[in-house]
Regions:
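Structural signature of tandem alpha-helical TPR/SEL1-like repeats
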Residues: 41-54, 75-88, 109-121, 143-155, ...
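Helix-start (N-cap) detector for alpha-helical repeat units in TPR-like alpha-solenoids
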Residues: 27-31, 63-64, 96-98, 130-131, ...
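Terminal, low-structured helical/coil segments at or just beyond the last alpha-helical repeat
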Residues: 29-32, 278, 342-379
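N-terminal leader/linker segments that initiate helical-solenoid repeat arrays
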Residues: 20-68, 74-77, 84, 379
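Structural marker of alpha-solenoid helical repeat scaffolds
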Residues: 58, 91-92, 125, 159, ...
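Bacterial N-terminal signal peptides that target proteins for export
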Residues: 1-9
């Protein structure tokens, strides 16, 4: 499973010229240079903040210095300080960009109503403001008003069809509504508009996989992996897609990469263990699944897989203990009941095996392996 989050608009630092008061011309000209240096740093560091602060001291009417300082403090995580500077900027000049920036800070502070008020004030003056519409959509989503948020973003897309962030957020919302075709279309558009946007490529791959478009999923996820070679999520997703395509060596390579990058990643360990079982590499599967079991000892799936690997190597006592642990933890795990049935069958306990196969089929009528096993022991 993955979680998707809406992205708020990125507000750029200002480098535009300023009106220089005649009585302080030299000081304000120096302030302009300080602001330019701050923009060049642009990392929210103490050094950047200090430059804007000095610029304000020299030229108190330089609105860009207040605004940029607010954004720098926002990047530092100093939201109260950021709010204060952005409000000072608005006092000097009631600008749409300043209010959008303030709304973003208020949202990060958890002041949803205050943030919404700022976006709405911008839209009253300029109904075509795409950043304000994007921000309003984020708030509507937080208020569980997803259909309204979608309509808001569709309006933004009509105003500016070149904004990749609008389409990315549309994809996230359509996905939340389980409109997977629409989500895939929105993510695809976002990628077309900005081929460097990792999240759009990654989520496009996830949607294509969910829709069964495995080759399209492969292409999108491979493109995402090229953008962020060390991102664990994309390699996990690639491993799943490769496995569905029957490309087990590539799936194994992806999972091993995740296990190497993040040894405590449970999903990678258990999926690698299952793949090793399919490849009949039972000893390594057992070692891998033991690692997974140490990470999540209450997960029935890992105990079922571990029991199956031990069963294939003839470690009957350990296999039975682990398979019974699996059904104890999750009595609805059809695979665990089937695997336990296979073990009991091999131990000559046909009646008990028959009962486990029947339970597996009752839980999952489409589990063909359990049906075939039941036919072998006799219904």
């Amino acid at each position: 499973m993955h979680k998707s989050y809406l992205k708020v608009s990125f507000i750029a630092l200002l480098t535009i010229g300023v009106v220089v008061p005649s009585h302080a011309e030299q000081a304000c000209l120096k302030s302009v240079e300080l602001v330019k240096k701050g923009v060049q740093i642009g990392d929210g560091s103490d050094a950047e903040v200090a430059l804007y602060n000095e610029a304000i001291q020299l030229c108190p009417q330089m609105v860009e210095a207040y605004f940029n300082m607010g954004l720098a403090l926002q990047r530092k995580g100093d939201f109260p300080g950021a709010e204060a500077k952005l409000r000072e900027a608005i006092k000097l000049k009631d600008d749409e960009t300043f209010r959008v920036g303030l709304a973003g800070v208020l949202l990060q502070k958890g002041e949803v109503s205050a943030s919404k008020e700022q976006y709405e004030r911008v839209l009253e003056q300029n109904p075509q403001s795409v950043p304000a519409l994007q921000g309003l959509a984020v708030i509507l989503e937080k208020q569980q008003k997803v259909p309204e948020a979608i309509v808001t973003l569709q309006k933004a897309a009509a105003i500016d069809p070149t904004n990749h962030l609008t389409f990315f957020n549309l994809g996230v919302l359509q996905e939340k509504q389980q409109h997977y075709d629409a989500a895939a279309a929105a993510y695809r558009k976002a990628v077309e508009l900005n081929s460097k946007h990792f999240e759009s490529k990654y989520l496009l791959g996830i949607m294509q996989s969910r829709l069964g478009n495995l080759e399209d999923a492969r292409r999108a996820l491979q493109a995402a992996a090229e953008s962020k070679p060390d991102d664990i999520r994309v390699h996990l997703a690639l491993g799943e897609v490769y496995e569905k395509l029957g490309e087990h060596s590539l799936a194994e390579s992806s999972l091993r990469r995740v296990a190497q990058m993040s040894p405590n990643n449970f999903v990678a360990q258990v999926n690698l263990g299952l793949l090793l079982i399919e490849n009949k590499e039972y000893s390594e599967a057992i070692a891998t699944l033991n690692k997974a079991a140490s990470l999540e000892p209450k997960n029935a799936r890992v105990w079922s897989a571990l029991g199956r690997a031990q069963l294939e190597l003839g470690h009957m006592e350990s296999a039975e203990a682990n398979l019974r642990q699996a059904v104890t933890l999750d009595g609805s795990n059809a695979f665990a009941h089937n695997n336990l049935g296979v073990l009991l069958q091999r131990l000559g306990k046909r009646e008990e095996a028959r009962s486990e196969f029947k339970t597996a089929l009752a839980l999952n009528p489409d589990l063909e392996v359990a049906r075939k096993n039941l036919e072998v022991v006799g219904e």
